[in-house]
């Protein structure tokens, strides 16, 4: 391994090779820009881009570089959504927890991995810091590893370490990590959070995401006891519960006493908390998102969101019609693992309408919409109007329950659709 410049390091990338770019809040921007600067020298480089946040513009995905880089997105993030919609790349539909296996078995071969790493510790180990998720498996499988050694990256434990000698080239940087502002819940989101918190027992194990609704749920859990954390994404919202002892991980079966996550999305305060924190481990997403590992914890509470839900309980979470706007992430993994957990419950939490006023509960999904969580798996749908408990209910009963938590402006329309579809078995049901 040698320290060098970014321009020199990316000369290890060859035409017709495949490159994995670390994602989350950990895009190795210095290396990626240097790679894009070589567009005129490179042809047919397959790029695997992961979930990402922030304003980084993904120069490899732009039209002028279409002959140089072929973008395969493992999660359609904001920075590439426009270019993929215009045909300058494609998404790969896959459960996040299964992608590491695709790296490992060669389905998605990785020649080069571009990584954003912490400074090495005394033993020479660097940490993936805020983004173990796919980076662990990609680094394990790639023939060539190029790393940014970043002063701003926290050192996290778990699977998220690699010896600096494994790197073919390293570039020293001091690049601030992307910070995700803490979303302030709206009144509707606070009501949703309250409904969910009331259904969470003491001793539960939480899987929860980022945004207004997750923050509302977490804020409503201050009076709970002995909660655990086994989640895909670590956020600022859990810190008050950890600091107050509400989350103590004492009842977990998998890694008791320790919080488990695969990536982190938050503020510098969160990243500083993670630095050499022995009460937190960052794991390969194939490990965190394994439903059969998730189920081993007691009372798993899996809380996820959706783009839209139909009257049978089908959940679309990654597209608006045929237009892919995100990825499935770990929703399916945790909804399945949570359902299998003893005492577990799963939730799809959504405001009743979009910001533009369209109902998120529909008679039928928008044509072309992809189903992420099937109607056979969904348990509870929650809006600001209440909780529709779908587990064990027939289709007419599901329709009634979902209409009752839809926005009042669309309930009559939904009732007509349900009556036409289910006839007397729906009409006999009372509100």
PLM ranges: what are they?
Residues 1-431:
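Conserved alpha/beta enzyme-core scaffold
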